[in-house]
Amino acid sequence: MRMRTPRLPVTRRQFARLLGGAGLACALPRIRAATTVGGPIVFQNTAPANGLDFVLHNDAAGRKYQVETVLGGLGVIDFDGDGWPDLYCVNGAALPSLEKSNPRFLNRLYRNNRDGTFTDVTQKAGVQGRGYDMGVAVGDYNNDGHEDLLILGVHGNTLYRNNGYGTFSDVTEAAGLNVQASGHKLWSVAAAWIDYDNDGYLDLIVSNYCDWTPGEDPVCGGLDPSERAYCHPDKYRAEPVQVFHNNGDGTFTEVSAKAGLGNLLGKGMGIAVADYDGDGLPDVFIANDNDRNMLIHNLGGGKMKEIGMQAGIAYNGDGRQISGMGADFRDFNGDGLPDILMTGLKNETFELFRNNGKGSFDDASANSGVLALSRPWNGWSCGLVDLDNDGLLDIFIACGGLDTNEPQPNRVLRNLGARFVDVSAGAGPDFAIPRVHRGVAFADFDNDGRIDAAVSSINGPVELWMNRTPMRHWLQLKLKGTHSNVSALGAKVICHGSESAQVAFVANSTGYACTSDLRVHFGLGEDRKVFLEIHWPSGIFQQIKDVACDQLLVIEESKSSSH
């Protein structure tokens, strides 16, 4: 285990230059709006022929247990450290027992064979799961260079420590992550690894949903079993947001109250992380299901404050709460400030909140075209990702109804600079296949510079949408912290091209109950060389000049700041 390293100071000039929220927006050249639409964004589903034979089972049998509707997390993890993204698939369990003894309910880990195929290594790795699982979070919590797995589930989470030789160990109890609330078991959906105090060790923020017990599940719809329906979230009590501090010795301590979030309750779903105000501290957005959304502002010194109402993200543009599901926290309009994407259910809205650089957000859903495009769809996991490598972040959304009788196709919205257009119809001959989709995790699974998408669907096969969009230039970065956490979560990268700049944070908690690739991806369009600025969580500032395009570059944190 790596020893703690003293923090190196960053100069006031460097801090102002890189971290000033409004200042950064002014200093960075804006990315130009696309004046012409390039070739189509095209995908090809290569599963299950490629070895990804996972099927998500919810054990629904007409009883309408609430947990049946909201599982489906996927996690991208390079568990063997070979530079090729592997895939972890979360699964359900038997109802009402929540037992996983039947092999069809096991979670699955698939190793990337580097040739377009995958191999199921679940049994050897020892990561089958323990119960009715929901989501997954990936991060190197003990800084040993091996990515670990946190599995979120109903009435119990599981921490798998990566042993570094193809196996994992269940260290949940030893790590102190079996903490529940007020004497009852929690239903966790998602979590984010986040070094909120920048001490070099990854802490945890856990998004819990509602108070649910199989034997006490209310009956909704008609009294006849054939008329039963899934209950509205209002039928259930909200649950607390949990914060766990990494003690640096392999254990965690719950510090929710100490951090200032002791009374923060919600019906938490998707969780996403970015430094929205440019103070060098990671902040957290949590989408809530028919409850106000949360923006957890990191105040420093181990303190946090929920400011969703003040920041303008608690409700949609009409002042209404919606069925918040998936979330992402990235810069869609190229002004250097991270914005928020949130999905909802049909006849609600997908929300796009634009960071105005003044500590709050404006609802950009209507002006961007996202509002009109979202009405017919039930959106779950999602992501702001550059699918055509033009330097603009597009939107990918996993869609599907609450019930298995309402399958829907996934959606792709192309970013034209000032607005989005739905290009799903041209995304490939099999892209329109409807299923009850839930999770989506993003990675360049074949390392060709184009971002691919793995998608889960309830009682259906996992889909692996390989990106076949016509090639443009690109750059991917794998950051390795030395003074900062090894995963480099929270680092900010500024990529300067010939006429524009892009800002990205190392953040892998995306969408709904999912984890995407830790690597930072930039679409470069026609640029062949770029200039990089990296601000590490430790405060170290690093510059790299004349970086060639079309490569995966591994960057280790420098010993001191460069000028």
Locate the predicted segments by residue.
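Hydrophobic beta-strand segments that make up the repeating blades of beta-propeller
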Residues: 87-91, 148-153, 204-208, 284-288, ...
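N-terminal secretory signal peptides
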Residues: 1-14, 21-26, 34
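Short, solvent-exposed loop/turn segments at conserved positions within beta-propeller repeat blades
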Residues: 99-105, 155, 234-239, 290-291, ...
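Gly/Ser/Thr/Pro-enriched helix-cap/hinge segments flanking short amphipathic alpha-helices
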Residues: 39, 60, 372, 402-563
